[in-house]
Amino acid sequence: MRAASDYGEPGPALERFAHERVEGVSQEEYPAWGDIKYLEPCLKVAFADGVRSVVLRYAKAAILTDGEAPELVITLADEHYPLLVDLHYRLWREHDLIERFAVMRNTGDAPIRLEQTLSALWHLPLDETYRLRTLGGRWGGEFQISEVSVPLGKQIIESRRGITSAHANPWFGIDRNGSASETHGDVWFGALAYSGNWKIVVERNAYGQTMVAGGIHDFDHTWKLDAGESFTTPSFVAGFTAEGYGDASRLLHRYQLDVVMPRSTASTLLPVLYNSWYVTEFDVNFENQAAAARKAADLGVE
């Protein structure tokens, strides 16, 4: 776990014109749709009376220590409607990662329709030279690295296939001006733990503020939150390293082994499936399968 002194001093304060309202440039942890806010909202709802603006205010906070990792829970409450939002922050110290998710709670008597419920939003230091790295591909060409300078406006990676696949992977990496390599350089990175329709939005405004928001895709999706019910978003795990993309990969890999995978299999060698019909196409018989098995044995396959 790195110390706070490892990360240097905060960047310069934002300079804005007098006619630019603070609501338009404030860096909220979980912005809701409504008022004069122009960046990607994490939360967008429709109340039973047709009102769609959400005005969230801090209500309380708690630190939980009875789980696998210490967890901060910040509760926000709408000023006018019975809607509570719990922001969860799990600190995985040994992995240098923060896991975030949100819980929406309807404490009233009427249903609330959830139209967008992202898991988290991450703010980056002020800079206009960021490079975004993503992973995409196809059958036979999985996990191709794509790199692009973060433009003014939005850059969206997404999947509308109903699954997470080689075509679009819910992961991002960001560095300054393409200066990071596998072994050195500042890298901000994260992965969304969700296998359905998802999106990650990277957005930079005219003042050089850059943020990353992600979660369940709002495309063709709404959720009816009845009275007394709650809705929990998937987790969005993110971190920072000054040691390049290689260290970012290893931090996520160790997290997957130590936290995500079942305890019964995380520390054991898993069996390998040898897809033998590829070498014979559909002409499968005992002789050619036995020959393939002998070659597999020479490679160390059990």
PLM feature segments, named:
Residues 1-203, 219:
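Polysaccharide-binding surfaces and accessory modules of carbohydrate-active proteins
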Residues 98, 113, 232, 300-302:
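Short loop/turn motifs at secondary-structure junctions
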Residues 251-302:
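An acidic-aromatic substrate-binding cleft motif
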Residues 102, 227-228, 274, 296:
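Conserved, mostly hydrophobic/aromatic
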Residues 117, 195, 236-238, 274-279:
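Active-site beta-loop-alpha junctions enriched in small/polar residues
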Residues 239-251:
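Short, Lys/Arg- and Gly-enriched loop/turn segments at beta-strand edges
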Residues 53-56, 223-242:
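Short Pro-Gly-centered flexible turn/kink motifs
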Residues 208-226:
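Short acidic, Pro/Gly- and aromatic-enriched capping/linker segments at domain boundaries
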